[in-house]
UniProtKB/Swiss-Prot annotation:
HAMAP family in the record: SurE
Protein name in the entry: 5'-nucleotidase SurE
A GO molecular-function descriptor: 5'-nucleotidase activity
Keyword tags: Cytoplasm, Hydrolase, Metal-binding, Nucleotide-binding
Catalytic activity: a ribonucleoside 5'-phosphate + H2O = a ribonucleoside + phosphate
Record lineage: Bacteria, Pseudomonadati, Campylobacterota, Epsilonproteobacteria, Campylobacterales
Subcellular location: Cytoplasm
Listed cofactors: a divalent metal cation
Enzyme superclass (EC): hydrolase
Keyword Metal-binding listed: yes
Binding site for a divalent metal cation: D9, D10, S40, N95
EC number of this enzyme: 3.1.3.5
Length: 262
């Protein structure tokens, strides 16, 4: 039986992770290693300044005490899988909230997939786009479309092959709709966000300032060809983006060389 390693960045008790386990358990052996706490927007961070504990919750289900999603993949491969054996597929999610455009660089969900493909394991990051600061998700969202989508993708990969070369992964975003409202899956490029530096400033009872980041609405740039991830979501498509780890700007290598030498 094929073997899938699951993780996330919302924590081991997230409803999105539970939905992922429910969806994939019938088609593969599942091992879960997830952060003990919410690690949203932690990026591709690896914990180097303190020891980590791999804590067994039940059979094939572990949490890492204060670890990141990247820690989860790294420690899993070195300690839970016998030498010479790797999972057939790593899936990170189901994230509560979108991971589109440059958000991928902040995302713990996407970073777990990055870590997997560094170790030459096919990987998918899957995120559920939500509304109203994700209160719809927290209040009993069924993840029906997300579960349908991930089963289709995982089955195709496990029965055939991964469609991307090494050091590339699939970034999947699910619109906040029912399966019968979905127009299908669309292959997309990562879009662009209009980033600001807004934060919410407050004063605590001791008169000290504190700030919350990430409470303001997301604003996206429209693309001319309507082929980016957030536009697919807006049109009720599942967005599937191929993402590569090589961030070299090859178009600029020659120009940069000329700039440096002249």
């Amino acid at each position: 039986m094929k073997h899938i390693l699951l993780t996330n960045d919302d924590g081991y008790d997230s409803v999105g992770l539970k939905a992922l386990i429910d969806a994939l358990s019938p088609i593969a052996k599942i091992t879960v290693v997830a952060p003990a706490n919410n690690k949203s927007a932690c990026g591709h961070s690896l914990t180097l300044d303190k020891p980590l504990r791999l804590i067994s919750i039940k059979d094939d289900f572990y949490k890492i005490d204060d670890g990141s999603p990247t820690d989860c993949i790294f420690l899993s491969l070195g300690n839970l899988f016998k030498e010479g054996f790797k999972p057939d597929l790593v899936i990170s999610g189901i994230n509560i909230g979108a991971n589109m455009g440059e958000d991928i660089t902040y995302s713990g969900t996407a970073s777990a997939a990055m870590e997997a493909v560094i170790h030459k394991i096919p990987a998918i990051a899957i995120s559920q786009v939500c509304q109203n600061r994700c209160q719809d998700i927290q209040n009993g969202w069924e993840f029906e479309l997300a579960k349908d989508t991930i089963v289709k993708l995982a089955t195709r990969i496990l029965n055939n092959s991964f469609p991307l070369d090494e050091r590339k992964f699939l970034n999947v975003n699910i619109p906040p709709i029912k399966p019968n409202e979905c127009k299908g899956m669309k292959i997309t490029k990562a879009g662009f966000r209009e980033y600001g530096t807004d934060s919410d400033r407050h004063i605590n009872p001791r008169g000290e300032e504190y700030y919350w980041i990430g409470l303001h609405p997301l604003i996206w740039k429209a693309s001319e060809d309507q082929s980016c991830d957030f536009e697919a979501i807006k049109e009720n498509y599942v967005s599937i983006s191929p993402i590569k780890l090589d961030m070299t700007s090859y178009d600029d290598l020659k120009n940069l060389e000329n700039w440096l030498n002249n």
